[in-house]
Amino acid sequence: MTIYLTELDTTSIEFPSPFDALDEPNGLLAFGGDLSPIRILNAYSQGIFPWYGPGEPILWWSPAPRAVFNPKTFEPSKSLKKFQRKHNYRVSINQATDRVIGYCSSLRPEEETWLNNDMQAAYRELASLGFCHSVEVWQGDELIGGLYGLQRGQVFCGESMFSLKTNASKIALWYFCEHFTQFGGQLIDCQVMNPHLESLGAIEVDRDEFLSSLRLLKETSVNDACSKKQWLKEMP
């Protein structure tokens, strides 16, 4: 079967409507363009994100349904709370964004990373411009887990997470949900559901609902203090 896709013009940052995305493969919308900050920010503001593998052109996606967290209602399990009381992992914001992106790009067993050098460079540039943020989890002075993503108003678009020690990424998400809510955050976009996200309480919403929420929430900023370098959990 022939697939017809829009090729993005390198002189324009415009995208097709997310409602034009293919059903199969789910959410594929366009190809080409570049990974400039202005294009990526425009994409995320419309519920579109880049994802492509080795040897492929830049591919742009807007899948349906969409996996999301409501940070207000996120509830860590009793076992996770007990684990954290015992281990006292430290948690920070934007203390090691480059390293978090680097760890997230590391190859997983039997998997080729989608987070290639160009993608890493793009997110690092967005971090330097104040749009990409990270959460870090530490055991003492050792970075053991974290997550990163882009913020568009009251929406945090989660990109990737990693764990080098048990429960580290879960703790990153837990503390970030509490922190983001405190500053007015309303929605965390996880893009596509997987068993790990589902186990943490992510839900799926249809494209209409997600894009409607995004259009509304991206227009209201959270306080700048939300993303300043800080510690959410220090050693007792």
UniProtKB/Swiss-Prot annotation:
Primary localization: cytoplasm
Keyword flag Isomerase: no
Gene3D superfamilies given in the database record: Leucyl/phenylalanyl-tRNA-protein transferase, C-terminal domain (3.40.630.70), Leucyl/phenylalanyl-tRNA-protein transferase, N-terminal domain (3.30.70.3550)
Pfam families xref list: Leu_Phe_trans (PF03588)
EC number: 2.3.2.6
Localization per record: Cytoplasm
Function: Functions in the N-end rule pathway of protein degradation where it conjugates Leu, Phe and, less efficiently, Met from aminoacyl-tRNAs to the N-termini of proteins containing an N-terminal arginine or lysine.
Keywords: Acyltransferase, Cytoplasm, Transferase
Name of the protein in question: Leucyl/phenylalanyl-tRNA--protein transferase
Record's GO cellular component terms: cytoplasm
GO molecular function, one term: leucyl-tRNA--protein transferase activity
Catalytic activity entry: N-terminal L-lysyl-[protein] + L-leucyl-tRNA(Leu) = N-terminal L-leucyl-L-lysyl-[protein] + tRNA(Leu) + H(+); N-terminal L-arginyl-[protein] + L-leucyl-tRNA(Leu) = N-terminal L-leucyl-L-arginyl-[protein] + tRNA(Leu) + H(+); L-phenylalanyl-tRNA(Phe) + an N-terminal L-alpha-aminoacyl-[protein] = an N-terminal L-phenylalanyl-L-alpha-aminoacyl-[protein] + tRNA(Phe)
The family this protein is said to belong to: Belongs to the L/F-transferase family.
Any single biological process term in GO: protein catabolic process
